[in-house]
Amino acid sequence: VNSAAPYFADPTTADPAGEGHVHDVLIVGGGPSGSSCAYWLAEAGWDVALVEKKVFPREKTCGDGLTPRSVRQLADMGIEDSLTGAHRYAGLRCHAFGKELNLPWPDHPSFPNYGYVITRHDLDALVNERAAKAGATVFQGTEALQPVLDPTVATPAGAGLPSCVGAVVKDKSTGATREIRARYVVVADGANSRFGRALGTSRDRSQPMGMALRGYYTSPGHDQPFIESHLDIRDSEGSVVPGYGWIFPLGDGRVNVGVGLLSTDRRWKGVNTGTLMEDFIAWAPKEWELSPATALGPATGGKLPMGLAVGPRLGATTLVVGDAAGTINPFNGEGIAYGYETGRLAAASLGEALSGDGYAALQRYEARLEDAYGLYYRVARAFIRV
């Protein structure tokens, strides 16, 4: 175990490991997948550098709900005990067409029977700090501008991405640029993944994609023991409109309220998510006391690539993880757990590669993804087309 003290590097200085140093792994992006990957690699003793363009804590658009699957990963990283300000909840309450169904989380041999609601503002800072405490060198406020490629390394069969040996990075506070080099590079820069696209990743447009919008509201239901999902939203005339809504209590006087819809709905291109949010707020159960007057600021949103719809995910020296690989669950829109898990799966393959297995170990990452999600995601993609 690497017991080095946390090191949040100053991006205006040379690499703390020395000029010309080559790290074992460079991770681009400090969200769930990147920080998870950094933690597991650093915990195993590898020399890891992580660059994150924002400075933690920072806002991040998300539903903020952690399922038992996420909690398991946080517990394995030793983080659950730090969730002191998070709201613990017991399950999901579903509303649809006048019916209500309470679904408590079941007892399970691998996962707890509870989840948490916590803002990504707080959560991502905790996980990133944990990676640093494990020994990862974290460069905050540092943007990866472009990959550094090695044209002398041939692209092996089955590797869809070129050989990447680092990144040109910029200190966003000064504008200074430099290179960070590594034997392997992990792309973990989220759903938009500019770094991944620069290497050649793209979304399979035949696969489903989601759109979502969320905002924070004050509510007397802020400490409810269930998160809520609303599977029918109606407009001002009472007609059902495409999309779904959620209300996730944060336990601190606030609730996270959002709407989403899938590209598999033939009407989705004509939907304005702002109008959809207004409709949902107007039709939400009255006990939540939601209205424009209780909003705590403007809603924010984004697009959600799902079901491993982004590729290639494998290069001669590169792996793509989390939202950058489109790992969001098509069934429920959950992304955090799959970010943690794919970061961990990538760390396992990279550890094997660094131990001598090289590219053969990287190929096992794809096999691990298939074992973990392949059949489930294929069923999910088929289901949401119905």
Predicted ranges, named:
Residues 71, 76-125:
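A conserved beta-strand/loop capping segment in the N-terminal third of enzymes
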Residues 348-386:
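C-terminal helical "tail/cap" subdomain of flavin- and related membrane-associated enzymes
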Residues 1-25, 40-44:
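Extreme N-terminal leader/targeting segments of oxidoreductases
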Residues 42-62:
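Glycine-rich FAD pyrophosphate-binding loop
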Residues 130-288, 292:
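Predominantly flavin-linked oxidoreductase catalytic cores and closely associated redox partners
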Residues 55-75:
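Conserved N-terminal glycine-rich FAD pyrophosphate-binding loop of Rossmann-like flavoproteins
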Residues 265-350:
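FAD/FMN-dependent oxidoreductases across multiple families
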Residues 30-31:
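Glycine-rich Rossmann-fold phosphate-binding loop(s) that bind the pyrophosphate
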